Amino acid sequence: MLARHGPRYGGSVNGHSDDSSGDAKQAAPTLYIFPHAGGTAKDYVAFSREFSADVKRIAVQYPGQHDRSGLPPLESIPTLADEIFAMMKPSARIDDPVAFFGHSMGGMLAFEVALRYQSAGHRVLAFFVSACSAPGHIRYKQLQDLSDREMLDLFTRMTGMNPDFFTDDEFFVGALPTLRAVRAIAGYSCPPETKLSCPIYAFIGDKDWIATQDDMDPWRDRTTEEFSIRVFPGDHFYLNDNLPELVSDIEDKTLQWHDRA
């Protein structure tokens, strides 16, 4: 495990550095953080603050959210990933080292965006996926058979939202676009030959019934590099009670792969 100390690299901490001087290897790696369904960048402030200055952190605000809770407009995971990639591209030079973390739905989006970075020639150090089933192993394929009310009930359990919101008819009607988003999440898949050329590290809570260890283990088939899965105590939002240990693991692995490059 790497020792914690002052920053090893120049540049800003919470965003892209405009400093173009020096060897690209000396640039601090940037970790892009993808929130869960219904989450916003603000929900990951505590997570971001656990890192040292050795890793830059950028939490992604999904298009159409404007800092509000709730899912962004979502036709499909790849379509939203295209939008996010177009939004993010100006923030990274081709040689800047990047890594990706995604929790729940954010894991699917982070994977798709990481693939786009890889295809564009960027240095992707690692992909960290949290509480997110591997493509083709996502549960609740039966969502097409659920009523609107049943699907919204499932959504509240997936996101931790207050279910009382959906007892109000006006709020319920306004939440109907969420149904399309949940179906898009449940229907996400990609060809089996689609892989990242960086390591994949998976994290999960031992009491998570939304994404189980069996659901996440097939992430090993989505990398040509090493894979591991770590189980923490807790449910789908296990990370809230395990931030120091989780962040330490992510930071250590990011810096180790950065130093190998």
Swiss-Prot record:
Thermal effects: Optimum temperature is 37 degrees Celsius (with palmitoyl-CoA as substrate).
Protein name: Thioesterase TesA
Highest taxon above the source species: Bacteria
Family assignment from sequence similarity: Belongs to the thioesterase family.
Activity regulation comment: Strongly inhibited in vitro by CyC17, a monocyclic enol phosphate analog to Cyclipostins, which binds covalently to the catalytic Ser-104 residue leading to a total loss of enzyme activity. Methyl arachidonyl fluorophosphonate (MAFP) inhibits esterase activity but it only reduces by approximately 50% thioesterase activity with palmitoyl-CoA as substrate. Thioesterase activity is inhibited by tetrahydrolipstatin (THL).
Positions of the UniProt region annotated as Disordered: 1-24
Originating species: Mycobacterium tuberculosis (strain ATCC 25618 / H37Rv)
Keyword Lipid metabolism part of the UniProt annotation: yes
Reactions catalysed, as given in the entry: a fatty acyl-CoA + H2O = a fatty acid + CoA + H(+); hexadecanoyl-CoA + H2O = hexadecanoate + CoA + H(+); decanoyl-CoA + H2O = decanoate + CoA + H(+); an acetyl ester + H2O = an aliphatic alcohol + acetate + H(+)
